[in-house]
Design a protein with these regions (language model features):
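Nucleotide-activated sugar donor-binding and catalytic core shared by glycosyltransferases
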Residues: 1-252, 258-386
Length: 386
């Protein structure tokens, strides 16, 4: 029997790895599935584990107040050393571009354990954008024995780096697997739908406002490279858009990071509770976020995963970054880059709200990130490696 260890530590990783954990667990006679979490995003991670009913076998619980990337890397590396010695997995699977992924892959390499990289081959070719994610994924890619690329372009990126084609499998993105499972769950469970409506209300937004065609712009922002002036420009643009479109609701679930919240208060003031059509709400669990995203008109974000998820729901995405490691979405027309440029943010949101044809061209474009069957392909591939 093969022992497979899946390691993740942030909410986005957990969302994309959860359906893979469940897929492996369907084959208990062939695979022993071991889950190790680092707790890099403690509270947000635990929410996802609960939604997908995943109980970790190991929890490094690395988070400490005021820690930096040095601390995170060191704690994951040392913690994984001990976990790998005890668990002795045949293969370690990591996801994407987080510090957890890179440090866990390095720890496995030090013990000569093969590494499988989920969401391999994404590249901006600029190690400082996004930072530190671009370097993280390049380092993880150098360590990986198996590379599970979400798209053909990702595979081409790897082959240009002299990665053997035999080690690469194009799978689609596991986030679409997760998204489809969750949307199906919400739409077929009236009690859950009502519960999520209540969650949103307690968080600060009443979805019953969305009647008679009222539109919603959903906003997320948390990237390190946007801290400082970038966030000020983003928030100023959003503030002016709320004034330009008083009939449209703007909802921003705020990340817990103080570097995100500080510029929001600088632009919008200390009291965020009495703004006309701008709603700053607390961070949402994955189920609640998907529920709100499904009801949105436009998504304005600096997130990576949302560039894949939102188009799966037919939502145009404006990306508040200067580069993206998801050029397939740009080529397909499901996303557009606006950076943190005030004028671009205002003009593109305005165009989508004012021009139906422009909106339809983005919302009806085909999502290039797969069919929801990525996890099955990964499990089948690794089973053949016995």
């Amino acid at each position: 029997m093969k022992k497979v260890m899946l390691v993740f530590g942030t909410r986005p990783e957990a969302i994309k790895m959860a359906p893979l954990v469940k897929e492996f667990q369907k084959q208990p006679k062939r695979v022993e599935t071991v889950v190790c979490v680092t707790g890099q995003h403690r509270e947000m991670l635990d929410q996802v584990l609960k939604i997908f009913d995943i109980k970790p076998d190991y929890d490094l619980n690395i988070m400490r107040q005021g820690q930096d990337l040095y601390d995170v890397t060191a704690r994951v590396l040392v913690g994984m050393r001990d976990v790998l010695r005890e668990a002795t997995p045949d293969v370690v699977l990591v996801h994407g571009d987080t510090t957890t992924s890179t440090a866990a892959a390095l720890a496995a390499f030090y013990q000569q354990i093969p590494v499988g990289h989920i969401e391999a081959g994404l590249r901006t070719h600029n190690i400082y954008s996004p930072w530190p994610e671009e370097m993280n994924r390049q380092v993880t890619g150098r360590i990986a024995t198996y590379n599970f690329a979400p798209t053909r372009l990702s595979k081409q990126n790897l082959m240009r780096e002299d990665v053997s084609p035999d080690s690469i499998l194009v799978t689609g993105n596991t986030v679409i697997d997760a998204l489809r499972q969750v949307v199906r769950k919400i739409k077929t469970d009236a009690e859950l739908d009502k519960e999520l409506e209540g969650v949103l209300l307690r968080s600060g937004y009443d979805v019953n406002r969305l009647v008679e065609g009222k539109r919603l712009v959903l906003i997320t922002g948390h990237r390190r490279e946007n801290f400082g002036d970038g966030f000020i420009h983003m928030c100023t643009a959003i503030k002016d858009l709320t004034r330009k479109y008083p009939e449209v609701d703007f909802v921003y679930p705020m990340h817990l990071n103080p570097n995100v919240r500080k510029p929001i208060h600088e632009v919008f003031g200390e009291d965020l509770s009495h703004l006309e059509n701008m709603f700053f709400i607390e961070p949402l669990e994955y189920l609640s976020f998907v529920y709100l995203m499904e009801k949105s008109t436009i998504v304005l974000t600096d997130s990576g995963g949302i560039q894949e998820e939102a188009p799966g729901l037919g939502k145009p995405v404006l990306v508040m970054r200067d580069t993206t490691e998801r050029p397939e979405a740009l080529a397909a027309g499901t996303v557009k880059l606006v950076g943190t440029d005030y004028d671009k943010i205002v003009s593109e949101v305005s165009a989508l709200l004012d021009d139906t044809a422009y909106y339809d061209a983005m919302s009806k474009a085909v999502n290039p990130y797969g069919d929801g069957l990525a996890c099955g392909r990964i499990v089948e591939f690794l089973n053949r490696k016995e």
